[in-house]
Amino acid sequence: MGEVFAGGFALLVVLFILLIIIGASWLY
């Protein structure tokens, strides 16, 4: 159960970083 949570959390972090990169490139 912990491994699944860790994997989901890692995926969430990656998506969040991608969102920041896309947002920054869109703003600038």
Curated annotation (Swiss-Prot):
Cellular component GO terms, alphabetical: membrane
Swiss-Prot/TrEMBL GO biological process terms: sporulation resulting in formation of a cellular spore
A Pfam entry, by short name: YjcZ_2
Primary localization class, coarse: membrane
Signals that turn on the gene: Expression is regulated by the mother cell-specific transcription factors sigma K and GerE.
Keywords, sorted A to Z: Membrane, Sporulation, Transmembrane, Transmembrane helix
Bilayer topology term: Single-pass membrane protein
Cellular compartments annotated: Membrane
Record's keyword annotation contains Transmembrane: yes
Superkingdom of this protein's organism: Bacteria
Membrane-spanning ranges: 4-24
Similarity comment text for this entry: Belongs to the SscA family.
Name of the molecule in the record: Probable small spore coat assembly protein B
Species of provenance: Bacillus subtilis (strain 168)
Lineage: Bacteria, Bacillati, Bacillota, Bacilli, Bacillales
